[in-house]
């Protein structure tokens, strides 16, 4: 009843906040699933990588896998593909080979970072502006309630209270949209940062392996 009785502007504010809240919750659950999958895949690939498997065999497994390769597997695939390509070229020194592989892995890492950070900016935006949008709706609703009092000769609390209550719902909805978004953003930003550090550490370790391998002709590891 309070929502239905609010002014059109306040109702529009409530609708926008409701949409923002629904989208935020959807992104929060999707991000939780995606990050959980990314951590699981990274751990599984790292176990396979450090199990002593031949790099050439591992590369064939990764490149032959169905679907798009993500995470550590994507970084490994990009680096080893460039490493193998440069080693086949005559006149290319070991340092150039390793630097080329490292650049390819950095590009792959950048793509993975972009994928991990998807939707975080939206959560940050919702968390920062929703309270102000709700406050705008509240201020507008209170102004409308007091303007309505100008048409009566004797104002009472009972006449203005419903309008103020309707307006305050906008603030409550703004907080309802903002709080989960802020919590989700802070939590997932921390998780993404840890994953990025994990990826970067693996990249540096793999570069060290490639540096040793680049100086041994005809080896794969």
Regions found by a protein language model. Name each.
Residues 17-20, 182, 186:
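Alpha-helical transmembrane segments of multi-pass membrane proteins
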Residues 4, 8, 14, 118-121, ...:
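Internal alpha-helical transmembrane segments of multi-pass membrane proteins, especially GPCRs
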Residues 153-167:
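Hydrophobic alpha-helical transmembrane segments and adjacent short intramembrane/lumenal linkers
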Residues 40-133, 142-156, 183-221:
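Predominantly long cytosolic amphipathic alpha-helical stalk/bundle segments
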Residues 167-181:
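Hydrophobic alpha-helical transmembrane segments of polytopic membrane proteins
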Residues 13-16, 20-23, 130-133, 137-140, ...:
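Residue-level signal for the membrane-embedded core of alpha-helical transmembrane segments
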Residues 1-47:
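Hydrophobic membrane-targeting segments
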């Amino acid at each position: 009843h309070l929502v239905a009785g609010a002014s059109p502007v306040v109702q529009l504010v409530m609708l926008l906040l409701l949409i923002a809240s629904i989208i935020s919750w959807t992104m929060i659950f999707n991000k939780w699933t995606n990050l959980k999958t990314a951590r699981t895949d990274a751990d599984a690939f790292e176990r396979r990588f450090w199990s002593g498997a031949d790099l050439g065999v591992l590369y064939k497994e990764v490149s032959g896998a169905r679907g798009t390769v993500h995470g550590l597997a994507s970084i490994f695939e990009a680096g080893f593909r460039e490493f193998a390509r440069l080693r086949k070229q005559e006149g290319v020194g070991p340092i150039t080979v390793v630097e080329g592989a490292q650049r390819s892995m950095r590009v792959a890492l950048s793509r993975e970072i972009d994928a991990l950070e998807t939707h975080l900016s939206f959560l940050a935006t919702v968390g920062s502006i929703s309270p102000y949008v709700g406050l705008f709706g509240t201020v507008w609703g209170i102004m409308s309630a007091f303007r309505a009092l100008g048409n009566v000769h004797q104002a009472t609390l009972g006449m203005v209270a419903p309008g103020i209550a309707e307006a305050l719902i906008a603030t409550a909805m703004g907080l309802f949209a903002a709080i989960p978004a802020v919590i989700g953003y802070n939590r997932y930003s921390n998780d993404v940062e840890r994953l990025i550090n994990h990826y970067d550490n693996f990249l540096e370790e793999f570069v060290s392996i490639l540096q040793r391998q680049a100086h041994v002709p005809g080896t794969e590891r």
